[in-house]
Structures are given as C-alpha cells and as structure tokens.
Amino acid sequence: PDELMPLPEESELFLLPGRRAVGLNPETGETEVMEDWAVAAFAAPAHTLTAHPVYMTDEGAPMLPLFAYGAVGFANGRFYVCAKKVDEDVRQVFKGISRGKIDRSARKIIEDFPDNRLMQHIMQNCTLRYGCPAAKNLSLGRYEAPLPTSRTCNARCIGCISQQEEGSKICATPQCRLTFTPTPEEVVEIMRFHAGRETEKPVFSFGQGCEGEPLTEAPLLIESVRRYREAGGHGTINLNSNSSRPQAIAELAEAGLTSLRVSLNSARPEVYERYYRPHGYTFGDVRQSIIEARSRGVHVAVNL
C-alpha cells in the first residue's frame, strides 16, 4: 500500500490488448493469470512511475506504442497507481481549463499566423492532434513555448519516440517527426509572440518529442537565440539535447542560452553507446558539452 497513490488528475488509462492481467490472490498468496485484458496508467506530468504492470502476452498480440506504462489498481471506488510526485511546478497542470478553450485559442493562432510554418505545426499537430502540454501552454500564452526545429538526428536511440529506423520491431512511434526546417524568422516570431503574452517568466524550449536532435540545426538555433536576445528578448531559453556538439553548445551559451537538459541514461560510456548508438560523436563529446555550458553560466540538468 505504501507504494500506491490515488491516480492523479489528468492521468490516462490504457487498455493493453492481447495481454492478460496478472494479479495476486489475497487468500492463497499466489499469482493468477486473469482472462481479462490488462490495463495500465500514464501518470500525469510531475509524477514518476515506480512499478510496471504485470501481464501475460498472448500469441499475436499487437506491439504497444512507446509510452510509459504504470501499474494501476482499483479499490474503494477509485484508481490507484504506483507512482510518486517529484515536481511541484504547475506548468503542465491544466485543471480547470477546458479542452474547448485550448482548441479555440489554437485555431485563432492558426488564423493569425498563416505564413509561419512552425506555428502552424505546433498548433495543428502538437496542440490539436497530440495535446502536447508545452504546445497547449503556447496556445494559452503561459509558461513554456516549444520550439521544434530538427528533421534529423545523430543518434539512433533504441526507444526513439519520433522515428524508428527501417526494420525496427517497433512499428509505431507516439509522435511524427517534423517534416521541414523552420527559418530563424519563424522561430523568433514565435518567441516574441509568446513573450508578449507570458510577460513574467516565459520559457522557450528547443528539443521536443516531435523532432530529431536540435544540435543538427545548430546554426539555426544560434541565429534565432542571438536575434531574440539582441532585440531585448527576456526569459529562459532552454535546450533539451543529446549534447553531442560541444562547440555548438559554447556558441549557444554565448548567444544567450539559459539552460541545458542533457539526455543521459548512464555515466558509463559502454552503456550510453549501447542505447543511444551515436553517429559522429562520442560520450566524451557529451561530457565536454556539459563543461562548456557550465563554464559559461548555463544551468545544466540531466534527463535520465
């Protein structure tokens, strides 16, 4: 019981087709395979799952998409999940905000920015199609604005959520990758628009689930950040990245980057490379990027 918490609001429940639930019989203490399909929970943002659901997979069961599947149960009229709250930030909490309000705002922005391809992508694909929290925040003019920029990647992560290599056993990714490269003008226009609405603490984040590695478009990022800062643009400019290009990180820091979140599954090179399968960079480059960022006052965090 101490591993469970009430399922947080804005969480999601998944049915796991072709997989039969496994449970513990409280009378015998033995595990039993049920005839019903298994279920799982995706905990709301700011929560970390602590246990996976247990099930038996039937022959011919479909491949599950790359989501986070948490162990969930039901008792006393409500759902419980194995998870812990790890962040008090409310930027991805939409309690009390109707989906209709978000959609109306997104459609208005689509009308107002007909020539900005990146804005069209974020509103149509990310907000209206996927319900991305960062994209919804941009539509509402609060907190964080996502800035996807890259069609390509220099890693071949086993669990990539935007594009799997040909022949992969993972037949479907949760998101579709960006299909064009935006211009600095398109990026900066979104930054200025967001800063004009979220006037207190605007955040701009390169490196989203619907793109490749943003550092493969380093000149675009550097130019966009420089233009925004030189025009007096304020706020936090963040980069979610594999941090594979130390020189680009250094130039971004000089241009006005505020924070860097480094994707890292292990501090052991052999384990890192086994998952990320880097192309054209090494684990040593990642370490050097962190050094370059910290030496220039950039806040560095690790995305495990």
Per-segment meaning from a language model:
Residues P1-E59:
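Short Lys/Arg-enriched alpha/beta "domain-start" segment
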Residues G23-G29, V93-P114, G141-S150, K201-E217, ...:
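Short N-terminal secondary-structure initiator segments
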Residues P62, F67-L147, Q164-P174, T181, ...:
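N-terminal [4Fe-4S]-dependent radical SAM core
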Residues E144, P148, E165-I190, H194-E223, ...:
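Core AdoMet radical
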Residues P148-E166:
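Local cysteine-cluster metal-coordination motifs and their immediate loop/turn environment
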